[in-house]
């Protein structure tokens, strides 16, 4: 129907669509504008250049705030009406990796060194240090648990979002893990690019199954159908 062009050929970051149909696209380049709000008809609503490339998927709150995390490990809260910066916060770490919002409006941000929880007004609620969240990753939220995929065989970590304590970790064998999703029974699925493996882990951290595939799983996510079929892009 339409094509929206940015200022140069580069890597795209995460994108999402608001309730009014506005598309928010982040870009992994700091030399150009790297956050775009695009109207449903393909015209630009606004654009903005933040302090670093954006590999992490953004998150959108119910009250119209877009949260973006750059590879300078700076978390931004942007007004979706015009792209104005409501607030920003520098985090520990050399890479910004993932952002999510829960039903209470709390924001979770993961970097190469920690996972943080903030209120909508920038108050830090807790910080879990010593976790290296995979760049270009996402979080999965289920009840009071946040699931994050980690780099360098660290696998999957489950975090209690009420206090920031680590519930458990599920280590892997091959490399960086990506894109956790949770089914209605609480089973968590994620991929790992080093060993080309798909994992299913129960809510208590125990193995459900592990499947090695013969295709490249670099940056590969998954989708789960209502009838229990897991689809994986390679």
Model regions and ranges:
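Extracytoplasmic/lumenal domain signature
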Residues: 1-234
């Amino acid at each position: 129907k339409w094509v929206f062009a940015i200022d140069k050929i580069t890597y795209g970051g995460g994108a999402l669509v608001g309730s009014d149909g506005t598309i928010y696209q982040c870009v992994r380049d700091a030399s150009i504008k790297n956050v775009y709000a695009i109207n449903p008809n393909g015209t630009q609503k606004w654009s903005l250049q933040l302090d670093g490339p954006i590999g992490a998927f953004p998150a959108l709150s119910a009250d119209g705030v877009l949260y973006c995390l750059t590879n300078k490990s700076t978390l931004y809260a942007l007004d979706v009406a015009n792209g104005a910066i409501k607030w920003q916060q520098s985090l520990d770490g050399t890479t910004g990796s993932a952002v999510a919002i829960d039903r209470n409006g709390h924001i979770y941000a993961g970097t190469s060194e920690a996972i943080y929880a903030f209120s909508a007004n920038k108050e830090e609620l807790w910080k879990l240090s010593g976790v290296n969240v995979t760049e270009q990753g996402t979080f999965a939220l289920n009840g009071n648990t946040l699931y994050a995929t980690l780099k360098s065989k660290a696998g999957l970590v489950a975090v209690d979002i009420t206090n920031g304590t680590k519930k458990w970790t599920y280590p892997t064998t091959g490399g960086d893990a990506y894109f956790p999703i949770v089914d209605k029974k609480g089973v968590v699925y994620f991929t790992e690019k080093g060993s080309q493996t798909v994992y299913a882990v129960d809510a208590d951290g125990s193995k459900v199954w592990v499947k090695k595939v013969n295709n490249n799983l670099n940056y590969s996510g998954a989708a789960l159908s209502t009838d229990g079929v897991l689809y994986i892009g390679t």
